[in-house]
């Protein structure tokens, strides 16, 4: 059975890529491509998470106008991000967070301090590393 005392603080990304809700979607797309990530946390002016923008959200933003041949001007992140966003704190248990992310089909969760300010992010990849690092007595590598 898993040793379940591993906490989010041990595996969170401490400097996640961020965008503002009022940012141009193409600026967010550049961030996603340049950092080779599948999405970003969207924050307000106080670094409080207000949404998540995924690659699929970005595709939807691009296709929503171009498919119909519409001139859209500036497409804002806030119009396509997933919101509201569920956040977690640094002391939450890795296994509990992994189960919640799986149940809600989410690839990332913002980590906030006691005032709701973003201090990090946990991703599915980070959770996989955490679970790999746990003691699994019956598992033999192949």
Where are these regions (language model features)?
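A glycine-centered beta-loop-beta connector
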Residues: 32, 40-57, 101, 109-126
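The conserved cystathionine-beta-synthase
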Residues: 19-36, 43, 88-105, 112, ...
């Amino acid at each position: 059975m898993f040793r379940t005392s591993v906490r989010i603080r041990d595996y969170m990304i401490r400097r996640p890529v961020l965008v503002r809700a009022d940012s141009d979607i193409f600026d967010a797309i550049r961030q996603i491509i340049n950092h080779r990530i599948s999405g970003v946390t969207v924050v307000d002016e106080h670094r409080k998470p207000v949404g998540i923008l995924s690659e699929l959200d970005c595709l939807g933003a691009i296709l929503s106008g171009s498919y119909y041949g519409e001139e859209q001007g500036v497409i804002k992140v806030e119009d396509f991000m997933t919101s509201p966003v569920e956040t977690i704190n640094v002391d939450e248990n890795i296994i509990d967070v992994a189960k919640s992310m799986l149940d809600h089909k989410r690839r990332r969760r913002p980590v906030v301090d006691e005032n709701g300010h973003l201090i990090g992010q946990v991703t599915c990849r980070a959770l996989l590393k955490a679970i790999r690092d746990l003691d699994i007595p019956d598992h033999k590598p192949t």
